[in-house]
Curated annotation (Swiss-Prot):
GO molecular function, one term: 4 iron, 4 sulfur cluster binding
Cell compartment(s), UniProt: Cellular chromatophore membrane
GO CC, any one term: plasma membrane
Cofactors required: [4Fe-4S] cluster
Major place of residence: membrane
Residue ranges occupied by any 4Fe-4S domain in the UniProt entry: 29-88
Enzyme Commission designation: 7.-.-.-
Repeat is among the record's keywords: yes
Protein name, entry field: Ion-translocating oxidoreductase complex subunit B
Residues where [4Fe-4S] cluster 2 binds: C113, C116, C119, C153
Length: 188
């Protein structure tokens, strides 16, 4: 019994050391811009952008093959942060190809749901709950708004709705200046 434990421990230690040496010897440095872009992306690896995960999108953005608006779950805030890194600012804080919109979540009309499980399988964050041939519903706190489930639904029972404001997601509006409050403009 002790011989087996000692031999397994020695084998584990030897293979661990071998993996450590291989990791150092065959390490490939990634460009720092790719790491910076990947750090800004949500990291859900949902594939809504059409790339294999957030790392693939970050590599494509660093090469200029993908627009900064490709990440739908990240929304406008992520697109603005990405525009600052890849230096494609649309001018004045605007991001080309992205309107300023409220975040959305999926909503299932339960009377149209057939329980086919296609939306359940496509959801990258497991925000849809339900069983086979049973009614499904969406957990709004877990939904990232990637709309993958909407495309997968054969009965069009899923729609995108504006994310409801809760105490977790509510923020004060940006204060207006005195000129904006009076409706006057500053003379140039």
């Amino acid at each position: 019994m002790i011989e087996a434990a000692v031999s397994m421990s020695a084998l584990g230690l030897g293979l661990g050391l071998l993996l450590g040496v291989a990791a150092r010897r065959f390490h490939v440095e990634s460009p720092p811009i790719v790491d910076a872009i990947e750090g800004i992306l949500p990291g859900t690896n949902c594939g809504a952008c059409g790339y294999p995960g957030c790392r693939g999108l970050a590599e494509a953005m660093s090469e200029g093959a993908a627009p900064v608006t490709a990440c739908a779950p990240g929304g406008r805030d992520v697109a603005l942060a990405l525009a600052a890194i890849v230096e494609t600012d649309g001018g004045g804080g605007a991001v080309p190809g992205m309107a300023e919109a409220e975040p959305t979540v999926a909503f299932i009309f339960e009377d149209h749901c057939t329980g086919c499980m296609r939306c359940f399988k496509r959801c990258p964050t497991d925000a849809i709950i339900g069983a086979n041939r049973q009614i499904h519903t969406v957990v709004t706190d877990a939904c990232i708004g990637c709309n993958a489930c909407i495309e997968a639904c054969p009965t069009e029972a899923i729609v995108a709705r504006v994310k409801p404001k809760t105490l977790k997601s509510w923020y004060w509006d940006k204060p207006r200046t005195a000129f904006e409050a009076r409706g006057t403009e500053v003379a140039a």
